[in-house]
């Protein structure tokens, strides 16, 4: 039984929590199609009209929204009983990022905001004449099914209702006098509802909601068919304005949908019920590590829980810094050595036994101690990473100063440390390293020039060249030679220097006793025996020691003149150590027999010493690695060599004219150099050659070496 009602009057009351006077709206709906139903287009027109009137003053938070709850009371004109009703309900959506929202611009229900989430589902029930509620059950069921279909296609643009900020709107009927008008308070009451237990004979009445119940709630007024009026009977003479939704007999078809809606709305209401009215503040972009949805404008328990689950950036930095300090961790970039990693010394940066007058140890140490003290005050700030990166080398220098300070106090060796701190900039380290090496070379040149002007024998600084180190450790491999510790070298210097001083004093006494003759200019000598006068065994030993010391000076100059790369040098060391035994096997009496003494008889011991000093001050452009085979001998082998020379002195003088006549001059030079190479490589060391021999070997080294290996017995 359909009732043809052409007009409906809808009165809407909007209440704002901050405004005492509610907004009153009155709508008249016309049933133009003759179906007697309120459609979604009608509801959309009502909602859009309400929003256009209040929407301009609403500030919408970007993460959520409020819901307008509008209750429509529709009654025919002149009727005193409730004849028709319509309920519009709006649900809150989950939180989303801010999107600009499109509004409904027309009243005919056209959907113009497709990008907005669907917020409100409106269900319009059948307008029936409700004089007898249980009449026409079949007709009502059909209408309810149609209305459910209408709900699914309801306008998405009703999100405009969401955007009312503080306006939790409660529809008030003009004549609401119901006993239990606060039965339906919030969405939380629906948790106890058992929708599946709906009974067809038990209708449900949605009553008016008090103004304060939804003031801070985003829950919508969802109609519960089962528990809203339990124990209450329906008054047949309900006053006009009461919303009545008749129950349906086949409730199982609707219960599943309603249950899903209830769960969805209750979940959103729990989240939104914790929000306060302070939504007008803009969101501060959080730098926390924790929850992405942690907003600064959330206060109370919600904000406390959110901040408990996240870490502020400042707190995170503090935790990381404390952990690094506790574990002594520091980020080391690639190819950068650690503090306690073994440091390899450069070959050319060796240690002198005595500190010259140019060095001022106390000044250097005082400057470095002041530098270390400045770093110990942690001038680089609170950051532990910067402190460990910049100030680590200063602490290492401080420890090295304590070590070297004790050695200097005992008269030992002092190594001048560079005054630059270790910074992450490798260019600074590289520059300071080479500047320090250049200054050291310049000081050494000045010292050599000063020694060359002095005509009496003085104690020379002992150069720790590779030959001297090989003399102490002849069986070490090339890698072991690279990692010799400085302590072993200093210990060797302390044991070595007193012996040399005693020998030099004896040499000075012998030189003073012998008659002084004007120094004659010698020819270019080819061997050590042309300078050494074989008078007694004691003099030969002293002269050999002097040659050893002067040869070390020559090595200093050779190192300053030619800088040998480390890889080439190691290769040459390996070659020389590998071929040393073969050269020794070839070195027998024939090698010694080719060398002669052609010293003019007028030259005495003092003049020979003077000439040696002059030769020693001349720079030699020869690679140290090539001449290393000439300077490898021990003191015991040297004394044995001198005794062999005395025994075969007469035999050498007899064989020399024959060899010189039988061979051309250039060929004789080759054999003399080759025999000398074999002698000083197999049985010699850092003590067996003069500066002239270095010159000669530099000119013919490769030819002599291969010639000697091919025909070692040729004389």
Curated annotation (Swiss-Prot):
Residues 257-273 have a biased composition (Basic residues). The keyword Coiled coil does not apply. It is found in: Cell membrane; Cytoplasm; Nucleus. GO terms for cellular component: cytoplasm; nucleus; plasma membrane. Residues 642-664, 673-690 have a biased composition (Low complexity). GO terms for molecular function: calcium ion binding; zinc ion binding. Residues 18-53 form the EF-hand domain. Keywords: Cell membrane, Cytoplasm, Developmental protein, Membrane, Metal-binding, Nucleus, Wnt signaling pathway. Residues 305-334 are annotated as: Required for nuclear localization and inhibition of Wnt signaling. Its main location: membrane. GO terms for biological process: negative regulation of canonical Wnt signaling pathway; neuroblast fate specification; Wnt signaling pathway. Residues 256-282, 639-690 are annotated as: Disordered. InterPro entries: EF-hand-dom_pair, EF_hand_dom, Nkd-like. It comes from the Eukaryota. Belongs to the NKD family. Cell autonomous antagonist of the canonical Wnt signaling pathway. May activate a second Wnt signaling pathway that controls planar cell polarity. Required for neuroblast specification. This is Protein naked cuticle homolog.
């Amino acid at each position: 039984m359909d009732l043809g009602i052409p007009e409906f009057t809808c009165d809407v009351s909007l209440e704002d929590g901050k405004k005492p006077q509610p907004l009153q709206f009155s709508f008249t709906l016309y049933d133009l199609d003759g179906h007697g139903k309120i459609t979604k287009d009608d509801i959309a027109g009502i909602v859009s009209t309400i929003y256009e009137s209040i929407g301009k003053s609403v500030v919408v938070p970007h993460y959520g929204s409020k819901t307008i709850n509008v209750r429509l009371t529709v009654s025919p004109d002149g009727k005193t009983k409730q004849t028709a009703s319509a309920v519009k309900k709006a649900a809150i959506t989950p939180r989303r990022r801010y999107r600009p929202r499109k509004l409904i611009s027309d009243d005919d229900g056209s959907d113009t905001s497709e990008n907005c989430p669907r917020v409100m589902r409106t269900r319009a029930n059948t307008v029936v004449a409700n004089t007898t509620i249980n009449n026409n059950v079949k007709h009502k069921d059909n209408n309810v099914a149609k209305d459910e279909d209408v709900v699914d296609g309801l306008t998405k643009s009703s999100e405009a209702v969401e955007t009312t900020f503080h306006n939790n709107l409660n529809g008030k009927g003009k004549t609401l006098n119901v006993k239990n008008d606060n039965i339906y308070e919030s969405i939380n009451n629906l948790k106890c509802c058992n929708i599946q237990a709906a009974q067809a004979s038990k209708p449900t009445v949605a009553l008016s909601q008090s103004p304060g119940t939804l003031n801070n709630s985003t829950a919508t007024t969802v109609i519960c068919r089962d528990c809203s009026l339990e124990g209450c009977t329906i008054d047949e003479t309900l006053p006009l304005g009461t919303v009545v939704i008749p129950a349906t007999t086949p409730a199982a078809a609707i219960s599943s949908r309603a249950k899903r809606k209830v769960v969805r709305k209750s979940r959103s209401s729990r989240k939104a019920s914790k929000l306060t009215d302070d939504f007008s503040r803009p969101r501060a972009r959080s730098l926390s590590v924790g929850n992405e949805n942690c907003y600064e404008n959330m206060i109370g328990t919600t904000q406390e829980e959110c901040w408990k689950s996240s870490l502020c950036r400042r707190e995170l930095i503090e935790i990381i810094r404390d952990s690094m300090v506790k574990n002594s961790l520091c980020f080391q970039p690639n190819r950068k050595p650690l503090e306690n990693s073994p440091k390899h010394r450069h070959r050319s940066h060796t240690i002198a036994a005595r500190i010259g007058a140019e060095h001022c140890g106390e000044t250097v140490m005082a400057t470095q101690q002041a530098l270390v003290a400045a770093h110990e005050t942690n001038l680089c700030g609170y950051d532990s990473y910067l402190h460990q990166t910049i100030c680590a080398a200063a602490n290492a220098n401080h420890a090295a100063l304590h070590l070297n300070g004790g050695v200097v106090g005992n008269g030992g060796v002092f190594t001048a440390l560079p005054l630059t701190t270790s910074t992450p900039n490798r260019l600074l380290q590289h520059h300071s390293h080479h500047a320090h090496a250049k200054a050291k070379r310049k000081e050494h040149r000045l010292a050599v020039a000063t020694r060359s002007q002095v005509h009496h024998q003085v104690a020379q600084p002992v150069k720790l060249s590779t030959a001297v180190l090989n003399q102490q450790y002849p069986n070490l491999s090339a890698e072991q030679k690279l990692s010799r510790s400085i302590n072993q070298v200093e210990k060797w210097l302390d044991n070595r220097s007193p012996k040399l001083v005693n020998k030099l004093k004896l040499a000075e006494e012998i030189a003073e006793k012998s008659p002084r003759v004007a120094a004659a200019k010698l020819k270019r000598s080819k061997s050590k025996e042309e300078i050494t006068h074989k008078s007694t065994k004691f003099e030969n030993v002293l002269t050999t020691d002097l040659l050893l010391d002067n040869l070390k000076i020559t090595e200093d100059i050779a190192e300053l003149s030619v800088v040998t790369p480390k890889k080439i040098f190691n290769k040459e060391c390996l070659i020389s150590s590998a071929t040393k035994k073969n050269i020794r096997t070839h070195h027998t009496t024939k090698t010694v027999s080719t060398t002669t003494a052609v010293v003019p008889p007028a030259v005495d011991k003092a003049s020979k010493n003077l000439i040696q000093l002059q030769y020693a001050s001349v720079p030699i452009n020869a690679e140290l690695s090539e001449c290393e085979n000439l300077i490898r001998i021990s003191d015991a082998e040297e004394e044995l060599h001198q005794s062999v020379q005395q025994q075969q002195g007469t035999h050498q003088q007899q064989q020399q004219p024959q060899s010189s006549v039988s061979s051309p001059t250039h060929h004789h030079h080759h054999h003399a150099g080759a025999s000398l190479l074999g002698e000083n490589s197999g049985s010699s060391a850092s003590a067996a050659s003069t500066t002239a021999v270095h010159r000669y070997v530099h000119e013919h080294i490769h030819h002599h070496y291969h010639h000697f290996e091919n025909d070692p017995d040729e004389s």
